[in-house]
Amino acid sequence: MMVLGRIVAPFGVQGWLKIHPFGDDPAAWRKMTHWWLAEDPDGPESAWVQYKLASCRPHGKGLVALLEGVPDRNAAEAIEGRYVGAPRDAMPAPEKDEYYWGDLVGLDVVNETDETLGRVSGLISTGAHDVLQVEDGETERLIPFVAAYVLDVDLAARRIRVAWQKDW
């Protein structure tokens, strides 16, 4: 399951939900007919409950959405704080040179001289750009996910090549 965001609050009295998205293109979520909700983002697939998306629209830096089965504010309050996710195959295909964070986590990171720098353990959104969290044992490197440093992402080979030195 790919975690997309989190329900942060009810929105109004008719069951609408305010969503904090974790990615940079939450408008693409409208293409999905169903969303899945869970209390624990790392829980088993069986813990995710499927909801049909009735409506979704941008709101500020996030989204507001209406799910079937959430008819009023009380029902919305009952699922506040839940994570929003979707199976990878339910997600819209990313554009060229765009990636879902979940597809990058676990990839090996090497530099231009083929030195292994570690493995992507997560990403951080800083507002200006995303940052790869690369772990190698006890060492963590934070590498900006921008063209100046990220030279190639090869999902098939499960490798990211970067312009970064091991001792930085």
Curated annotation (Swiss-Prot):
Principal subcellular localisation of the protein: cytoplasm
GO biological process: ribosomal small subunit biogenesis; rRNA processing
GO cellular component: cytoplasm; ribosome
UniProt keyword list: Chaperone, Cytoplasm, Ribosome biogenesis, rRNA processing
Molecular functions per Gene Ontology: ribosome binding
Domain PRC barrel: 96-168
A Pfam family reported for this protein in Swiss-Prot or TrEMBL: PRC_RimM
InterPro entries: PRC_barrel-like_sf (IPR011033), PRC_RimM (IPR056792), RimM (IPR011961), RimM_N (IPR002676), RimM_N_sf (IPR036976), Transl_B-barrel_sf (IPR009000)
Entry superkingdom: Bacteria
Cell location: Cytoplasm
Gene3D superfamilies: PRC-barrel domain, RimM
Subunit details: Binds ribosomal protein uS19.
Function recorded in the entry: An accessory protein needed during the final step in the assembly of 30S ribosomal subunit, possibly for assembly of the head region. Essential for efficient processing of 16S rRNA. May be needed both before and after RbfA during the maturation of 16S rRNA. It has affinity for free ribosomal 30S subunits but not for 70S ribosomes.
Family recorded in the similarity comment: Belongs to the RimM family.
Domain notes: The PRC barrel domain binds ribosomal protein uS19.
Alphabetical list of PANTHER family matching this protein: RIBOSOME MATURATION FACTOR RIMM
Name of the protein this chain belongs to: Ribosome maturation factor RimM
Species assigned in the record: Azoarcus sp. (strain BH72)
